[in-house]
């Protein structure tokens, strides 16, 4: 079975990319257990709790990330440089447990996957 990486690189609200990526991730988890999730660039904002999407008439799907553990999706990585660039601390309580990696280590980890889907 191919190893599949899901890369979240966009802000959570304003586009449907994050929600669609999460839906695809959960659906794919029924087919394979060789999955990993990467949060890079503005995608790190997907990890923040307490968002108010109703203010922009968007659906609140961020809490659904908490289901990753129930779907046995345990490989979650977040770009440490992206966190710093956006003024976020790696110690921030995120909605999922994601391991911070520097950009070069993150690229090496991502290279281990056969298919990369970006949202």
Swiss-Prot record:
Entry keyword set: Cytoplasm, tRNA processing
Location in or out of the cell: Cytoplasm
InterPro entries from the UniProt entry: DsrEFH-like, Sulphur_relay_DsrE/F-like, Sulphur_relay_TusC, Sulphur_relay_TusC/DsrF
Signal peptide span: none
Biological process per Gene Ontology, one example term: tRNA processing
Bridged cysteine pairs (disulfide): none
GO cellular component: cytoplasm
Source superkingdom: Bacteria
A Pfam short name: DsrE
Subunit record text: Heterohexamer, formed by a dimer of trimers. The hexameric TusBCD complex contains 2 copies each of TusB, TusC and TusD. The TusBCD complex interacts with TusE.
Family: Belongs to the DsrF/TusC family.
Function of the molecule: Part of a sulfur-relay system required for 2-thiolation of 5-methylaminomethyl-2-thiouridine (mnm(5)s(2)U) at tRNA wobble positions.
HAMAP family linked to this entry: Thiourid_synth_C
Name this polypeptide is given: Protein TusC
Species, as recorded: Shigella dysenteriae serotype 1 (strain Sd197)
Lineage: Bacteria, Pseudomonadati, Pseudomonadota, Gammaproteobacteria, Enterobacterales
């Amino acid at each position: 079975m191919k190893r599949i990486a899901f890369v979240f690189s966009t802000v959570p609200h304003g586009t449907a990319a994050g929600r669609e990526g999460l839906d695809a991730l959960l659906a794919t988890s029924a087919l394979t257990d060789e999955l990993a999730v990467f949060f890079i660039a503005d995608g790190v904002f997907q990890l923040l709790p307490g968002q108010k999407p109703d203010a922009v008439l968007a659906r609140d799907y961020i809490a659904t990330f908490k289901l990753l553990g129930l779907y046995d999706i345990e490989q979650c990585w977040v770009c440490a440089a992206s966190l710093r660039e956006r003024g976020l601390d790696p110690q921030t309580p995120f909605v999922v447990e994601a391991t911070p990696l520097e950009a070069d280590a993150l690229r090496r980890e991502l290279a281990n996957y056969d298919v990369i889907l970006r949202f």
